[in-house]
């Protein structure tokens, strides 16, 4: 299935320092429009996000999941279904293979889903991270800034 791989903080929601509190959630209206258009065009929506706040001890995986569930509920109110969220909990200096722009999260998705790679796309707010991730997995990239 064609898939939209989309970043979270700064792309779907306003980036706050280590977002993890549901009361801090602000979803960009243009991101909702974009997600709706891709979903209407038959794309599966998967979030791929770096969450170094977990590795730094600023918040727990449980808090991350609570924030994610809250965001997903808000998106569902707009008819948007997020199929999955893949995240890297590591700090940049941990040199893992899952922190974007590394491709480990993409490999995880491919283990779990059948992806029509030629028809898929990456959307994010940072060319040096999300764009480089897209280039490494050989997918087109769309920059979304608010």
From Swiss-Prot:
Question: Taxonomically, what lineage is the organism?
Answer: Archaea, Methanobacteriati, Thermoplasmatota, Thermoplasmata, Thermoplasmatales
Gene symbol here is: gmhB
Required co-factors: Mg(2+); Zn(2+)
- Per UniProt, Zn(2+) binds at 88, 90, 96, 98
Q: What is its main location?
A: cytoplasm
Origin organism is Thermoplasma volcanium (strain ATCC 51530 / DSM 4299 / JCM 9571 / NBRC 15438 / GSS1)
Biological-process GO terms, alphabetical? carbohydrate metabolic process
Enumerate the SUPFAM superfamilies for this protein. HAD-like
Q: Which Pfam families does UniProt cross-reference here?
A: PNK3P
Name recorded for this polypeptide: Probable D-glycero-D-manno-heptose-1,7-bisphosphate 7-phosphatase
């Amino acid at each position: 299935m064609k898939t939209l791989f989309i970043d979270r903080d700064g792309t779907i929601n306003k980036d706050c320092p280590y977002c993890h509190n549901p009361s801090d959630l602000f979803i960009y209206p243009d991101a909702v429009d974009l997600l709706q258009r891709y979903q209407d065009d038959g794309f599966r929506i998967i979030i791929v996000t770096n969450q170094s706040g977990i590795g730094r001890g600023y918040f727990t995986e449980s808090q991350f999941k609570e924030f994610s569930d809250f965001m997903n509920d808000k998106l569902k109110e707009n008819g948007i279904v997020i199929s999955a969220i893949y995240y890297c909990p590591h700090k940049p200096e941990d040199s893992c293979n899952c922190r974007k722009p590394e491709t480990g999260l993409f490999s995880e998705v491919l283990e779990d889903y059948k992806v029509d790679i030629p028809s898929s796309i990456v959307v994010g707010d940072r060319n040096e991270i999300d764009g480089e991730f897209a280039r490494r997995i050989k997918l087109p990239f769309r920059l979304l800034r608010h």
